[in-house]
Structure formats: C-alpha cells, structure tokens
Amino acid sequence: MKLKEVTEGKVRIFVPDPKEYMIEGKFDPSWAPVFYNPKMTFNRDLSVIVVSLLKPKIILDALSATGIRGIRYYVESWKSEQLILNDKNSTAASLIQINVKNNGIENAKIFNKDANALLYEIKSEYIDIDPFGSPVPFILSSINATIRNGIAAFTATDLSPLEGSSRTSCRRKYDAINYKLSSSKELGLRILIGKIIREAATLEKTVHPLFSFYADYYYRLFVIVESGARKADENINKNLKYFGECPRCGFQTFVDENCKTKCPICGENFIIIGPLYIGPLHNMEFLKRMIDTYSDFNYLSSFNRIQKLLNVIEKEAKYKSVFYNISKLASKLKVSAIPPIDSILECLGDASKTHFAPTGIRTDKGYEEIIRCVKSLR
C-alpha cells in the first residue's frame, strides 16, 4: 500500500495515496484499503473543541481507520490517560500503529477487533462512533460501554432514511415512520436521537443531547449517558412524541400519538412522522462554553465556518419549536415571491435563522404570525 503524508489540525498522518486508487480519474475514500475522508475535517475540527472541554480520562474511537480522529483528540484536545483506537481491518490497525508513533503518542492501546465485540469488553468515559453510513449497529454496545455521565458521540451519514427519502429503510433501521417534510433536515436528527433514547432504555440508561448539528451530508451528535430505569422512563414519557405537518397550509406541531389528526388551521389530515425526540438539541451551558472557547482554535482550517455555525446555533437554540422552511411554506400558500429571510426575522421580532436550512427560520411565535409576515412582505 502506497502512503501519502497529510496534515490535519496539528497532526501529520499517513493515508493511502488517492492516486493509486482512482477509477477513471475519480477517487472515493471507500475505494482505498483504509478509509480517510478529508471532507470530514470540519466534523473532526468541531469534535476537537468538544473533547477539549470534556477532558475525558479515557477516549475510545471504535472505528478508527487511519486513527486520525483519536490522534487529533490526544494531540489537540486533551492528553487523556488512555487513548484506545480500534479497527477490524488489519491493514487499518497496522496503519494506526504507524500514525500513533509518527505523532509521539506512547500510551495508546490499539485493537484489531470488531467494534461491537470491543465495546462489550471495555468501559470508557468518551466513546466515538464515526461509521461509514448508519450508527445504528453500534448504538447499543456504545451506550453500554459508556460510564455513568460519560459521553457518546455519533456521526450519521445515511440521510436518505432519516430525512424521509427512504421510508422503508427508516422503519427498518430507526423504527420510525417517516416522510419527506418541509423541516426534514432537523426532523432526521430528532429521529436519530429518539432511536438512541429507546436503545439506551433497554439497558436502563438514557441520554440527553450535549451538542448536535447538521453539516454537508451528515449529522453529528454528542450525548450525555445517564443510568437508571426511572430516568429512562421519564425521558421517554417527556421527550418522545410524533410530529405532524399539514400538506395543505404548512402548519406544523408535535403530537402525542401516531393517529389521524386534523390540522387546526384548515382541517386537512396531518402527515405524521415519528417517534422522535422533541427536547432541546443542545445543553445550553455547554454551548456557552464552546462559544467562549472556540477562539483558542483559530489555527483550524475550518475556523471561520465553525464561528458561523456556532453563532447561528447560539441564536436558534433558545427556541423550542421546529424551524419553518419559508420557501416550502410560501409554496404551499401560493406566494410566488419568497420574502427575504432577514425581512421576515425583522417582522417577527423574536426569531432567528437556523443552521439546518438557508430558507429556514426558528421562532416560538404562532403560525398565524409567521403567515402574516410572509404575506405582508411578498
């Protein structure tokens, strides 16, 4: 395997040389013997900031590939007492050895095991699951392996089922009914969180989002893992419901059950999806710490993008409602000219943009008030 040295953040690692694995002049990271995706640098950059605040004693990256994620945590975030890197691909495990040594890390434990098998053998304060596709096969084992009040982090790149484009796949993987709706970018994340909550409950554990976001073609989520059957029951009863959108007028709301429910505005039957999580997507105290800290990481290649994302999330996080997609709403209302988002925000007064969609707004003001602004500004 021919290798190429690359720099990401403050580390230098060896990865398979893309030129050796091109097909008709094109390259996909999955074609190489060991997976390395430079397009996930933003994901890893933000994760470095999160881990720097958590300072876990043990870090476990269960699907390490080149080892880039765990190595960056150790070098840039926090020199944990123990760094555990694993990949079931023996070629990857050998490459991890090289990259760990190349970055002067002496206390790393490297495994060449199936991720689930390892997760049932080891407990950790911080566990990272960054798979190629869905994290579902690893949810139960990773929650089981996370100690009380520890953190589990998940990446999901299978947006087709989560956003409602592949309904049967969503039902199979996430045990949720799904349709493509106006706010599916956010609803997909809520379906993912709902699935993790239900899986954790089978272990008499529960989870609460610490920080989460959507970017490019994936969701990234950090959850606090708590123990106790009572806490699990309380979280399910309080925060797992369904979501309804009116196909005629665009009114949307959370609903208690998956049953025929009529829109209170126009009387049309709702399209119902779920179950999904309806609570806050971030821990506000932790979010404030991120905003106070991220400037220390101005060397990151995606620093400006991180700054923009956190600025938007800080504003939208205070609202409890799912965002309204003004473009889709205007279409349902037969409004030909979509008003500028900034004008709608000014009209509403108490509202913000959302990082989920460029034409989305988030507000706790009522549907009628939103419609008034959309129609008055057309």
Curated annotation (Swiss-Prot):
InterPro entries: SAM-dependent_MTases_sf, Trm1, TRM1_arc_bac, tRNA_met_Trm1_C. GO terms for biological process: tRNA N2-guanine methylation. Residues 4-374 form the Trm1 methyltransferase domain. Zn(2+) binds at C246, C249, C263, C266. Signal peptide: none annotated. Keywords: Metal-binding, Methyltransferase, RNA-binding, S-adenosyl-L-methionine, Transferase, tRNA processing, tRNA-binding, Zinc. GO terms for molecular function: tRNA (guanine(26)-N2)-dimethyltransferase activity; tRNA binding. S-adenosyl-L-methionine binds at R44, R69, D87, D114, A115. It is an enzyme of class 2 (transferase). Gene3D superfamilies: N2,N2-dimethylguanosine tRNA methyltransferase, C-terminal domain, Vaccinia Virus protein VP39. It holds the Pfam family TRM. It catalyses: guanosine(26) in tRNA + 2 S-adenosyl-L-methionine = N(2)-dimethylguanosine(26) in tRNA + 2 S-adenosyl-L-homocysteine + 2 H(+). It comes from the Archaea. Belongs to the class I-like SAM-binding methyltransferase superfamily. Trm1 family. PANTHER family: N 2 ,N 2 -DIMETHYLGUANOSINE TRNA METHYLTRANSFERASE (PTHR10631), TRNA (GUANINE(26)-N(2))-DIMETHYLTRANSFERASE (PTHR10631:SF3). Dimethylates a single guanine residue at position 26 of a number of tRNAs using S-adenosyl-L-methionine as donor of the methyl groups. This is tRNA (guanine(26)-N(2))-dimethyltransferase. The gene is trm1.
